[in-house]
Amino acid sequence: MDAGAFLDASQRVPPPAPTTWLSGIFETILGAILLWVVARSIPQANSLLRGWVGMLALILLLHFGTFRIVALLWQSLGVKAEAIMSAPLRSTSLGEFWGKRWNLGFRQLSHELIFRPLHRRLGADATGFLVFAVSGLIHDLVISLPARGGYGLPTIYFVLQGTGMTIEHSRFGKRLGLGQGVRGWCFMMVFLAVPVFWLFHPWFVLGVILPFMRAIHAL
């Protein structure tokens, strides 16, 4: 997140709207129900499905719910604290999804440490592709290494994201309108969803997520 804005006492923000609170509370409760009720009801024979439901529930419970409520608490005190997720499915391009709406904390770090120092030397597209490659390696460290399998698949996933964003920014992509509207949204979802099993591969779901769910008595 933007620590400078967070610590700047001169930047005061208005209190969040009640509907924003309701959204954060709803997503927290829904995530908890999916994690401790729905996932448990899935037969043990469908372990991979169990793990996927539990993993999505954790993302909803934490990233979209609890972390959002924490940000709202700070905002109610006048502090400029942004939620790390900003309605990512409203994006109409990969660039908007990864750059403005998904996991803004990681986006801030990668922008400060990689993109800003290198984009003038390498160009925006090449530096953006490099950011995706580095993101893939980091996700391999936190996903594949603990799972002891699936090495390289998260990196390939993020390289594909960089490839998709390069296509969006190309003349061909602009001519087809891939960075906007319904067509842009569909193009984005193909790149995000079709290869997502390379990011959260079975080794991770079965070897990390399921044991974690048992540890928190979700199974």
Give the label of every model feature segment:
Residues G24, T28, G51-M55, A124-G128, ...:
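Residue-level signature of transmembrane alpha-helical entry/exit and packing/kink sites
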Residues W52-L60, F132, P154-Q161:
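Hydrophobic core segments of alpha-helical transmembrane domains in multi-pass membrane proteins
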Residues I29-L34, A133-L137, V159-T163, V190:
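Hydrophobic alpha-helical cores of multi-pass transmembrane domains in eukaryotic membrane proteins
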